[in-house]
From Swiss-Prot:
This is UPF0208 membrane protein YfbV. Belongs to the UPF0208 family. The gene is yfbV. The keyword Transmembrane applies. Residues 66-68 are periplasmic. GO terms for cellular component: plasma membrane. It is found in: Cell inner membrane. Keywords: Cell inner membrane, Cell membrane, Membrane, Transmembrane, Transmembrane helix. Residues 1-45, 92-151 are cytoplasmic.
Length: 151
C-alpha cells in the first residue's frame, strides 16, 4: 500500500502514480472541504483535455501573425506543462505519508470496513495518501454513504 521510502520514487514514475491516484481518489463532494484533491484532479483533467489544443492554437496564431517564434514556443510549452504539473503534484501527494490527524481517521474508516465484514490487506509501513484513496474508494462502494457522519 505504501512505499518504504518516499524519497526513492523515480521522477517519471510520479506521473504514472499521479494518474493512478487521480483514478483512485473518490470524487465525492463531502471530501472537498477536507482534501484539495477534488479540485486538483478536476483541473488536471481539464488541462489534459484542453491545454494541448490551446498550445497548438497559440503557436499557430503567433506564427500566422508574424510574431516572434521564441515567445510563441514559450507560451506553448507553458500550456503543455500545466497538465504535467498537476500529475506530478498528484504523484507526490500519493506517496506522502498521512499526517497524524488524518492517520487516525484512516484507521477509523478501515475499522468500519472491517466491521462491515470486508477483508482488508494489512497496512505495510506508514500509510500514505494512495492507501487513503484506496480505502475511501472501497468505503464509498461498500458502506452506506453515511459512514462519514459518524467519523
Amino acid at each position: 500500500m505504501s512505499t518504504p521510502d518516499n524519497r526513492s520514487v523515480n521522477f517519471f514514475s510520479l506521473f504514472r502514480r499521479g494518474q493512478h491516484y487521480a483514478k483512485t481518489w473518490p470524487m465525492e463532494k463531502r471530501l472537498a472541504p477536507v482534501f484539495v484533491e477534488n479540485r486538483v484532479i478536476r483541473m488536471t483533467r481539464y488541462a489534459i483535455r484542453f491545454m494541448p489544443p490551446v498550445a497548438v492554437f497559440t503557436l499557430c496564431w503567433q506564427i500566422a501573425l508574424g510574431g516572434q517564434l521564441g515567445p510563441a514556443v514559450a507560451t506553448a510549452l507553458f500550456a503543455l506543462s500545466l497538465p504535467m504539473q498537476g500529475l506530478w503534484w498528484l504523484g507526490k501527494r500519493s506517496v506522502t505519508p498521512l499526517p497524524p490527524s488524518i492517520l487516525n481517521w484512516f484507521y477509523e474508516v478501515r475499522g468500519k470496513l472491517q466491521e462491515a465484514g470486508q477483508a482488508l490487506a494489512p497496512v505495510e509501513g506508514k500509510p500514505d495518501y494512495q492507501a487513503l484513496a484506496d480505502t475511501l474508494k472501497r468505503a464509498f462502494k461498500q458502506l452506506d454513504k453515511t459512514f462519514l457522519d459518524d467519523l
